[in-house]
Amino acid sequence: MIIYATAVQTINSFVRLESLKEVYGLIWIFVPIFSLVLGIITGVLVIVWLEREISAGIQQRIGPEYAGPLGILQALADGTKLLFKENLRPSRGNTPLFSIGPSIAVISILLSYSVIPFSNHLVLADLNIGIFLWIAISSIAPIGLLMSGYGSNNKYSFLGGLRAAAQSISYEIPLTLCVLSISLLSNSLSTVDIVEAQSKYGFWGWNLWRQPIGFIIFLISSLAECERLPFDLPEAEEELIAGYQTEYSGIKFGLFYVASYLNLLISSLFVTVLYLGGWNISIPYISILELFQRDQIFGTTIGIFITLAKTYLFLFISIATRWTLPRLRMDQLLNLGWKFLLPISLGNLLLTTSFQLFSL
């Protein structure tokens, strides 16, 4: 009996140990995801505040100043207000499509953050096909917009959804060709490998200098993918009221609002990773890898700071562009994508391929 009791105690202790291992394993899985989501939310709140302050400066007026110091909590106050607003649904609309559309738009953009390297070895999923995964996932978002427009049973919403789909297709191809040119230069589809390939030559090793034409095309295409002025035709207020968002209210409207800024942030991060050297400080004789080897926490912190500094520099350009340029017509937008950007990006890809072949 004593031997039997001892065996039972041993088995129970083993089961408890395995249970603790499973709990710790789940914690190690969810902590990075939760940290990334929290960082993304904070980044979006900062972008909203920056846009309001920059737009106020451009228009020579006073921006938000009552919600928190310098109006920093204004975006949080607006989000809280949307949470408590009534969630309306069109009586003759397609309820499943109407409800699922915003979720598809947000989730497809959130998944793209998993392949962004914020610092050395600080990436949620270091995949060999990270860039390809981003392009594949980003092509899902227009489906959600089209579903929202169709499910609203509103001519303005449906036309906005069609415009969003047409605009996304028109500018997704030049953007993909620019990304392929970067992949050829780096000999990899991994975002981490692309950053490390630029770090070999410091500041002059950035793909911005090796691919200036591709950078300009990527810049224009990313703004069009984000549906920002001068490419905000899917939600042009003077023509379509609010486009595919016309029938939405409350939290679902808030999801579209958040999705637009999430898309802007992910585009800026990919500009940093693909063309601006990522987390590298790009100062001669100073390397993030050396700092990382000396002090891992300090090196990681510096890498995150450099990545975000480059990202918000591009965000400033995007925000200033919105408040300074007029909106294009639909025919001008499509002509720019199909007749100019597509041939130039294809020629840039062929030129890059030729250089890579001759350098072998």
Swiss-Prot record:
Stored InterPro entries: NADH_UbQ_OxRdtase_su1/FPO, NADH_UbQ_OxRdtase_su1_CS
Gene Ontology MF term list: NADH dehydrogenase activity; oxidoreductase activity, acting on NAD(P)H, quinone or similar compound as acceptor; quinone binding
Keyword Protease on entry: no
Location in or out of the cell: Plastid, Chloroplast thylakoid membrane
Bilayer topology: Multi-pass membrane protein
One GO location term (cellular component): chloroplast thylakoid membrane
Protein name from the UniProt record: NAD(P)H-quinone oxidoreductase subunit 1, chloroplastic
Organism listed in the record: Lepidium virginicum (Virginia pepperweed)
Name of encoding gene: ndhA
